[in-house]
Amino acid sequence: MKKLFVLCVCFFCSITAAGAALPDLKIEKLEEGVFVHTSFEEVNGWGVVTKHGLVVLVNTDAYLIDTPFTATDTEKLVNWFVERGYEIKGTISSHFHSDSTGGIEWLNSQSIPTYASELTNELLKKSGKVQAKYSFSEVSYWLVKNKIEVFYPGPGHTQDNLVVWLPESKILFGGCFIKPHGLGNLGDANLEAWPKSAKILMSKYGKAKLVVSSHSEKGDASLMKRTWEQALKGLKESKKTSSPSN
């Protein structure tokens, strides 16, 4: 049975009730040439988690910013755009966790170019996961010149977390680095570095018109400041926890 893709006007809650059937992949048009894709996966300890990524159109070419959680949803996403006359020219994964890289293996099998930083590929390899076909080491890397910039602000949610800047629309995809309501999964986080990295991001993209996070609502540039505040709070709490009792 063919599933309907819904163009929705608002984001879903980051975590929905566990045990319910997973919602279908969602696609939302943000503005001309920029779409948000939203996928869902049940994650142990977190329930059903919502994950946002982007699709950026450059003429008749389409670029995926993060894959959905699974190969199945990645294939659906690709087909949705192919059926509308677009060619998938490349994908970038913002960090090594499966909510950004879950579709890499399928994309590689379809000869769709996959990109990640060298650090992300190293972490994927250490985790026994399929790596992106192409990698880069630059702090700032143009996936498409003057259209799609990939930037490394420094460690935070993970050692390798990247953000993606769309200069024409002034949209920043902050991925899992942007955490305005709490830092979430800290399993691979660098709490010492996160506040400084957030400051770097604020300095570079403070004029962003719209900021898209992986797991929370979209908003304005204040999401970066709120992330910095959460990072400072998380660092202070971690130091209290690790301090020896008197």
Curated annotation (Swiss-Prot):
A beta-lactam binds at residues 99, 179, 185. Keywords: Antibiotic resistance, Hydrolase, Metal-binding, Periplasm, Signal, Zinc. Residues 1-20 form the signal peptide. Its cofactor is Zn(2+). It catalyses: a beta-lactam + H2O = a substituted beta-amino acid. One of its GO terms (biological process) is response to antibiotic. One of its GO terms (molecular function) is beta-lactamase activity. Transmembrane segments: none annotated. Zn(2+) 1 binds at residues 95, 97, 157. It is an enzyme of class 3 (hydrolase). Its main location: periplasm. It is found in: Periplasm. Pseudomonas aeruginosa strains carrying this gene (identified by PCR) have been isolated from hospital patients in Italy, France, Argentina and Thailand. Monomer. Confers resistance to the different beta-lactam antibiotics (penicillin, cephalosporin and carbapenem) via the hydrolysis of the beta-lactam ring. Exhibits higher catalytic efficiency toward ticarcillin and piperacillin than blaIMP-1. Exhibits catalytic activity for carbapenem compounds, but has a preference for imipenem and ertapenem over meropenem. Has high efficiency for the hydrolysis of cefuroxime. Exhibits hydrolysis of all cephalosporins tested. Exhibits no hydrolysis of temocillin, the 6-alpha-methoxy semisynthetic derivative of ticarcillin. Belongs to the metallo-beta-lactamase superfamily. Class-B beta-lactamase family. This is Metallo-beta-lactamase type 2. It comes from Pseudomonas aeruginosa.
